[in-house]
């Protein structure tokens, strides 16, 4: 995963762990995070022109074509924001409802910390899939955004993402 990609033979953070002493020491990770921002019912657009009495294979083909057409229209309606979003259209209730999920995609993700593997592997049994299982398998990443809190490519001037809501 992401930590393996950041590890090298000279700096094996997978084995030795890593904790950034400050934000400048955080390491850019090679993945994106999508935050679900909106769900829109697009059933009428997807099922427009689909005959009720079609056989299953023909209906599936027609629905797939309508989903692609609807997705294209929905993405185009985003205007300049379309580069910051991924839209997925999913089928619900056996193809009787279709919802478009709008994910705002943040591309500047940085590793803050991960413990050394020795914290989770001790006692000679590293893969105990039975309880009790004692391990410390986690890592911390921070999302960065541009000065107006919107997605941006990596830039040292980016600021930590400020969520609208958080746990107290």
Question: Predicted regions span which residues?
Answer:
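Terminal presequence/propeptide segments associated with secretion/organelle targeting
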Residues: 1-168
């Amino acid at each position: 995963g992401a930590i393996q990609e950041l590890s090298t033979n000279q700096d094996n953070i997978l084995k030795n762990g890593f904790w950034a002493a400050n934000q400048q020491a955080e390491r850019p990770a090679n993945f994106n995070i999508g935050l679900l921002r909106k769900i829109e019912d697009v059933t009428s657009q997807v099922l427009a022109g689909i005959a009720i009495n079609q056989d299953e294979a023909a209906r599936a083909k027609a629905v797939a074509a309508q989903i692609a057409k609807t997705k294209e229209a929905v993405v185009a309606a985003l205007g300049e924001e379309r580069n910051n979003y991924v839209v997925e259209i999913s089928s619900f209730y056996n193809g009787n409802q279709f919802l478009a999920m709008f994910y705002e995609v943040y591309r500047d993700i940085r590793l803050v910390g991960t413990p050394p593997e020795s914290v989770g592997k001790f006692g000679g049994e590293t893969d105990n899939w039975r309880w009790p299982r004692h391990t410390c398998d986690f890592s911390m990443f921070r999302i960065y955004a541009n000065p107006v809190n919107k997605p941006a490519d990596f830039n040292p001037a980016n600021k930590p993402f400020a969520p609208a809501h958080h746990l107290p």
